[in-house]
Amino acid sequence: LILAAVFIPTVFMTGITGLLYQQFAVTIAISVLLSAFNALTLSPALSALLLRPKQPARGPLGRFFAAFNRFFDRVTEGYVNISRSAIKRAARSMILLAGLTVIGLGIGRILPRSFVPNEDQGYFFMQLQLPDAASLQRTDAFALEVEKVLAETEGIQSYTTIAGFSLLSNISQTYAGFYFVQLEPWDERGARTADVIMRELNLRLRERPEGLAFAFGPPSIPGVGNAGGFDMMLQDRSGADGVEYLTENAKRLIEAASKRPELTGVFTVFRADVPQLYAGVNTDKVYKLGVNVTDVYTTLQALLGSAYVNQFNRFGRIWKVFLQAEPEFRVKAEDIGSFYVRNEDAEMVPLSTIVKADPSVGPAFTNRYNLFRSIEVMGSPAEGYSSGEAMAAVEEVAKEVLPADITFEWTNMSYQEANAGGAGAVFALSLIFVFLILAGLYESWSLPWSVLLTTPIAIFGAYVGIWARELDNDVFAQIGLVMLIGLIAKNAILIVEFAKAELEAGGKTATEAALAGAKS
């Protein structure tokens, strides 16, 4: 009951953090029900079959049991003596308990914070980035060179190459591509973890003249973003017409963040000066020649891009029909002259007479976040730093270098981490629930304190263990702390219940009953 009670407050937590708590709560609740069923039904029956009168053990096994019993008796006596000393010096014991509580809370505050630890999931991604407006043929050629490096790397089982699409921006681009790299099973790789392999690949590929290629891990929780590390959106609230102002501030932020020791690999896939062709329609000529403007834009879209026509059934399948010009007829800007549009007199008018393509530069895409024009900035914590420390460093840099009309919002996994607060409130509510249940069980407001006062020592030990192992105070550690509260309360209840029964039976003082409970 106590184990289930400590997880009741987690039902009110929102977001992915709440889901993680709730899943663990369901697991604990079902386990407690199965344990209770076993204790009330199977255990008594098995005890009747398995228990035998005590007989002196003989042989090597008997000597082992005798030695173990002597050792256990000495440990028990030592524990009882410590308990007796603590009872005699109650004031000092309470001061020590208060000191351990303060130290434990202090260690908890200085522990590095993170959301969910990065794990070796058996795969990772790679991103290819060539010069802006590079052709798909150049991207394919570079991808083949990178594949040779992947084939030579130990620990990689297979890989899938997709050229012409950026995984980080989710945009189709001829000068981008990505890999899905599947690693060998964990037991076959040994010490070659995913992080080791990614670092090795990044070192081998960082100075390639053809373009940029780098490896990055997946998000800790599949489906929450496309990459690990931190992810933020810079928002332009100035109302500027173009992206130049936002781009300038994004560069300032990345430059300043790259100098922080907590951060590594800070970048953005946004480019504001990608070579483009601007197709301008001469509306005066359009009306003079009797051409419908809508037909002009529809023809450009269908032949230079693509247009969905219809679908048909054949061979038991549904086939979709798309209209698009052959690649060799849409290579150069002059190829627009090969396309025609019909005017009011049913005459075919070449598009080159009413459309002029001029070279220009501009962004390949623009993002909108909270309805504001935005740029996505990504990065990773440096080695030895947690994601919480990295996000705090980014926030400090943003406050220093960004003007008031450029704001930022966390997104994907970083958004979940930034909104994963409330662990302290959950711990407090868990303790309150345990206290109320014990107060109802013992019909006393004082006895539950003897159970609850054991939890600070347990939390102190847990925080010391996390600190000694140089781990992060993440969601899993917090779930473990809630679980620890329930386990410690359960053990304390057994001791208090036995001591209470001894005291009510008569013949023993409160101190003797407490020592009997400790010895039991």
Give the location of each predicted region.
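Signature of alpha-helical transmembrane segments and their immediate interfacial
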Residues: 62-115, 519
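Transmembrane alpha-helix boundary/anchor motif
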Residues: 12-16, 37, 41, 45, ...
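Transmembrane helices with small-residue packing motifs
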Residues: 11-20, 98-134, 188, 215-216, ...
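Transmembrane alpha-helices and their membrane-interface boundaries in multi-pass membrane transporters
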Residues: 1-12, 19-65, 179, 457, ...
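N-terminal membrane-entry
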Residues: 26, 373, 419-433
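Hydrophobic transmembrane alpha-helices and their membrane-interface caps
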Residues: 8, 12, 30, 34, ...
